Design a protein with these regions (language model features):
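Secretory/extracellular carbohydrate-interaction modules
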Residues: 1-54, 136
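Surface-exposed coil/turn segments at beta-strand junctions on protein surfaces, enriched
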Residues: 10-12, 69-71, 104
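Short tryptophan-centered beta-strand motifs in secreted/extracellular beta-sheet-rich domains
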Residues: 17, 72-81, 87-89
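Hydrophobic residues embedded in beta-strands of well-ordered beta-sheets
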Residues: 53-56, 85-87
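Short, aromatic/His-centered strand-loop micro-motif at the edge of beta-sheets
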Residues: 54-77
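Short, isolated positions in well-ordered beta-strands
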Residues: 64, 96-97
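Short strand-turn-strand beta-turns centered on an Asx-Gly dipeptide
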Residues: 90-94
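Flexible glycan-contacting loops in extracellular carbohydrate-active proteins
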Residues: 99-134
Length: 138
């Protein structure tokens, strides 16, 4: 299980993460992206795991952002407005989620693949990323 961390820590402004992610069939119970940093009891503002071929929000397997995500490239955009305290998630250009963040003073983007042990996870943990970019509006 590997995850990349964008080393830029931010505490204000509007920040956008974008990239193309490919999740092979058989990967389940794996988070592919998160915005780290939040007030306790949370560790992250947003977490996007894949369960049974569905991109979900946190560990809520009923909060599906995209279905049939296996074996295809998917464009993911995540916009975090720190002052407003909200996050928008776009999948393939379509707005799929608007949520309040979980606070926190410092944040950073983390992406790749890492296990989430709250539901049965698969032995296969794999995700491929390309065209990753970070944008900011101070």
């Amino acid at each position: 299980m590997h995850a990349l961390i964008m080393q830029k820590v931010y505490s204000s402004g509007v920040w956008q993460f974008e990239g193309d992610v490919y999740v092979p069939w058989g990967t389940s119970g794996a988070s592919v992206m998160q915005i780290f940093g939040a007030n306790k009891p949370h560790a992250s503002t947003v977490m996007l795991p894949v369960y049974d071929g569905k991109l979900t929000y946190y560990h809520n397997v009923t909060k599906v952002l995209a279905d049939r995500v296996y074996d295809r490239w998917m464009r993911l955009n995540v916009v975090h407005d720190v002052a407003a305290g909200n996050v928008a998630v776009f999948v393939d250009g379509e707005r799929r989620l608007d949520v309040q963040g979980h606070g926190g003073k410092e944040h950073y983007f983390k992406f790749g693949v890492y296990t989430q042990g709250l539901h049965n996870h698969s032995h296969r943990m794999e995700a491929h990323w390309k065209n990753v970019a970070i944008y900011t509006k101070p």
